[in-house]
């Protein structure tokens, strides 16, 4: 991209987790192409630091899972937020950008915007799915929302929030036509025969709820299709131990290969995928594999969620297509027999071909060169701010 200006602009950024660090680093690269003298400060991770970011706190201090953990660390988190707000209010940047972590960043954006600072937010919270009234706070907090998915942008337009759909970075990383045979070779899996990848989730709670059901599904399928093999990627050592314990009930009789991490590679090597709802469903779509999506919560949590949930679907392929492309089996429907039957249908060759075409279309839809699109949108916002400030000074 051609530089817009040589003036030294300053951008405040807060990213709270690894995915935000990755997005932040990509965005910084493209902003520096437009503003070679740009400087960046706030909270960021290793990748952003490599791009010259000045972080006030270690990003890991924001990466907290679960309500109980958040409550335990609340005083520290509030102090960090206050320090960020005070710093940028005292020395206003050209723009402040929150990346994901909405419970932490949107409060900062609101206070800074009230102080007259231009603000943007990168990665929409799931307001379109539940707690939709959050959109009214977001409308007050940001001058611009940058979304990874097109249906999110539609939701903001309906609520008159300035928005730009920039595409999803995963759609650029994952090739349009992944090579199944090469991936099997890389993972040491036999090139012949059918393989199902099984992904019960990356968090302990998910694996506790879905792991036993998924393993019983493997047993159900093995009885009916003894030729099919299974591969389970474990997100980390704790998940691997958990899955190994769950497999013990079958005494090593199931044709299962446990692999450390490499979940995307396992999906590429498979003919079909059984997985928990979440970002993994988007990856499964991008590697063009048929899938069966399962979702299970504790009974009370599910009861609450059912009443709050506004979206028609839970999996990203269905939300993107706005139709039931892939089967979703939720709560009491997620039984070994129902999951097994759905997987057998997904292994059908004709079914696979038609899904591949659908998935390729969706892949192209969200492959927009996200970092470049986001940087251009941010630059437009900065330049608009400059014109407005100049006009105010000139008394126009």
Swiss-Prot record:
Catalytic reactions on record: a lipid X + a UDP-2-N,3-O-bis[(3R)-3-hydroxyacyl]-alpha-D-glucosamine = a lipid A disaccharide + UDP + H(+)
Pathway: Bacterial outer membrane biogenesis; LPS lipid A biosynthesis
Family annotation (CDD domains): Glycosyltransferase_GTB-type
Keyword Hydrolase appears in the UniProt entry: no
Superkingdom per UniProt: Bacteria
Coiled coil: none
Keyword Metal-binding: no
Positions of transmembrane segments: none
One Gene Ontology molecular-function label: lipid-A-disaccharide synthase activity
Matches recorded under Pfam families: LpxB
EC number: 2.4.1.182
GO cellular component annotations of the record: membrane
Alphabetical GO biological process terms: lipid A biosynthetic process
InterPro entries hit by this protein: Glyco_trans_19
Keywords: Glycosyltransferase, Lipid A biosynthesis, Lipid biosynthesis, Lipid metabolism, Transferase
Function: Condensation of UDP-2,3-diacylglucosamine and 2,3-diacylglucosamine-1-phosphate to form lipid A disaccharide, a precursor of lipid A, a phosphorylated glycolipid that anchors the lipopolysaccharide to the outer membrane of the cell.
Similarity field: Belongs to the LpxB family.
HAMAP family for the chain: LpxB
Protein name in the entry: Lipid-A-disaccharide synthase
Originating organism: Hahella chejuensis (strain KCTC 2396)
Chain's gene name: lpxB
